[in-house]
A protein has these predicted regions:
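The serine-hydrolase catalytic nucleophile loop
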Residues: 32-45, 202
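Gly/Ala-rich beta-loop-alpha elbow adjacent to hydrolase catalytic centers
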Residues: 98-106
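Catalytic nucleophile-loop/oxyanion-hole region of alpha/beta-hydrolase
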Residues: 64-89
Length: 225
């Protein structure tokens, strides 16, 4: 596995890992707070190595081994990171594989580079999650804290409380997708566990309805998390 760093175009280095092979190249887009050392990323890399298929893993700014600060991140910045990695480190047709927030980032990247899309895979994809799963679930007092302080720390089952910034919420509103048709023509596969405690499985059904392409399939795993 080749490793390196690439500038995201805004002065921040992004860490990446890449494996050469046959196309299309798979690009993994991690979730909020996750990185390329996670289980899904490493499993995908192992599968690609076994199949002799090209794959690119990378960390968003403020995540994993990349530079930057997590609380400076927004959906727009992380989508720009994804495009910097895709444009600078891949060539030819792509299959984007997005997990949770990575599904949203991946959709934004796919819409920005439609001519390169050979396919899109969403794993519990969470487009618009800053609004639908964060802002709309906040209590009035939590919203007031966020507006006043610019950051709200919410409990996380995975470790330390997660900082949610006002900038993340406000920027997310500039990139919402689920309120209109999503013009993505490539084949799409949406995988979702019905026991997912973070992203409701119905999200994938709604996303499938919004996608305008004809080749869209949703796979639900009844006991999957």
């Amino acid at each position: 596995m080749e490793r390196g760093r690439i500038d995201n175009g805004a002065g921040t280095d992004l860490a990446w890992q890449r494996l050469g092979g046959r196309g299309p190249t798979l690009v993994f887009l991690p979730g909020f707070g996750s990185d390329m050392t996670g289980d899904k990323a490493t499993a995908l890399a192992a599968l690609c190595q076994e199949r002799g298929q090209a794959v690119l893993l990378f960390d968003y700014s403020g995540h994993g081994a990349s530079g930057g600060t997590f609380t400076d991140g927004t959906i727009g910045r992380w989508a720009a990171d994804a495009l910097a990695a895709i444009d600078g480190l891949t060539a030819g047709p792509l299959v984007l594989v997005g997990s949770s927030m990575g599904g949203w980032i991946g959709l934004l990247a796919a819409l920005a580079r439609p001519g390169r899309m050979a396919g899109f895979v969403g794993v519990a994809a969470a487009p618009d999650f800053t609004e639908a799963l964060m802002w709309e679930s906040m209590l009035p007092a939590e919203r007031a804290t966020l507006e006043r302080d610019g950051v709200l720390h919410i409990p996380s089952p995975y470790g330390e409380p997660t900082p949610i910034t006002r900038a993340l919420i406000e920027d997310g509103r500039q990139h919402l997708l689920m309120g209109a048709p999503i013009p993505l023509a490539c084949p799409v596969r949406l995988l979702h566990g019905q026991a997912d405690a973070d992203v409701p499985w119905e999200t994938s059904l709604r996303l499938a309805q919004r996608l305008t392409g004809e080749d869209v399939q949703v796979v639900l795993v009844k006991d999957g998390e």
